[in-house]
Amino acid sequence: CSDVAAGMGARAELSIQESYGPLTNTDQITDVVRKNAEELLGCNHVVLEKEPDLGTEDFSYFAAARPSCFFHLGCAPSDGSPVECLHNCRFNVDEACIATGVNMQLKNVLSLLTL
């Protein structure tokens, strides 16, 4: 790093800070969540991501301590109108997704109580 910067007539300083750990879903819990999502939303509305994502998520602390499954709940308007990104002051959630999320979590809790 410093040699590359020196070659351009500059100085460089590298500082690496500890961040969140990897977020890894538990297969057994993920299977339950996937099944519940397919029952509630239909198979054509459930996407199981297999490829790693380079983002970070503080839920990784929970997942490291207990079997878990992190999932996303879509909140785009059903009419297909554009949606701003999350964590944006212009983001306007379609509040109909709240009931869907509550129903999804209720199904998950009831299913996981029987494991």
Task: Pin down the residues of each PLM region.
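Metal-dependent amide/peptide-bond hydrolase catalytic core
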Residues: 1-115
